[in-house]
Amino acid sequence: MMNRIVNDQITLIPYYRNDEISLLWYQDSEVCKQVDNTDQIYDLTKLHKMYDYLTSHGSCYYIQYEGVLVGDVTLQDNSELSIVISKEYQNLHIGRRCVSEMIHLAKEQNMVKVSAQIYPFNTQSQRMFLALGFQKVDEEWYEYKLI
């Protein structure tokens, strides 16, 4: 995998182990609630297990915004998309731009759709995915049809 340039501020960098930065994102209980619907923060074991799974089942990238790693985004082989952005960088449309780039990646990989699981309380993510053209297909699932 190579870097994916989203725009002059955002670059997606293929995952590499960087516990010092990434563990901080997953030690925020509000972020964990958005991602896993749990208030339990991650330890290194859980973080490694998650990234090992994501990297062996898809394309996992760090999100670099203006030179700073601020989150991660993954397009799994089963077409499921996941994204995490540290709280202090949310609401800057970084996620919107990264999800759009993952849609382009899905097209390059000849996927027929992209799906995302978003919990009912996460209205911020729901609004973003709907604004990008995703359709709600179930209580927690959103899809973007590519064909």
State what each model feature region is.
Residues 1-52:
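A short, well-structured alpha-helix characteristic of acyl/acetyltransferase catalytic modules
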Residues 15, 85, 118:
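Hydrophobic adenine-recognition pocket in adenosine-nucleotide-binding enzymes
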Residues 106-118:
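Conserved GNAT acetyl-CoA-binding A-motif
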Residues 96, 120-138:
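Conserved active-site alpha-helix within GNAT-family acetyltransferase domains
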Residues 4, 121, 135-147:
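C-terminal "cap" of GNAT-fold acetyltransferases
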Residues 37-88:
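Acetyl-CoA-dependent GNAT
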Residues 89, 93-101:
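Conserved acetyl-CoA pyrophosphate-binding loop and the N-cap/start of the following alpha-helix
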